[in-house]
């Protein structure tokens, strides 16, 4: 994996998804040159990206993948036969998934606070971010919804904490494990577990297994609220 200090240009495939657009905003605020593509370009995410000066290329085209790209982030909805993915692989450009990118760029040297559960993640993540902000902790966060309090859905940490939503859905076409296993949780809020995502989980017990795996990687000095 390429060291962060050697990365200047980052390209996001499927940049207009809620999480990917938030990540793009974080990366740009961190000083990286950020571009990306999507086949579904529409508000509010397209407006957010364009207002930040991030170039969005419509559709997925091989010509978009150039050698000056240092790192590619591939969204969950992107398939293995995507034309840009094929170009990335042919050119040997390093690529990672969305949750891997969060870990790589924003969870190092931070206490990772992960809100997970079948329902209520976005609301709870927003509340936790606001509580920490109000307490003067200056947390980083990435939330799957727009927060009027912050006039945004992401922020770079200026303290010890980064708050994120832990999704049990699979990571990418090249990583079928749950996203939340990439977040190195120091502590977590678990809102509840129900059967969901019938396209990848057999039954409720299968879903519970994923959450058990997540709980088992919480830091030994951390905690779980449920």
Region locations from a protein language model:
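ATP-dependent carboxylate-amine ligase
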Residues: 1-45, 49-56, 68, 72, ...
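Phosphate-binding loop of NTP-binding sites
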Residues: 3, 26-29, 63-67, 76, ...
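N-terminal glycine-rich dinucleotide-binding loop that anchors FAD/FMN and/or NAD(P) in oxidoreductases
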Residues: 51-61, 160-163
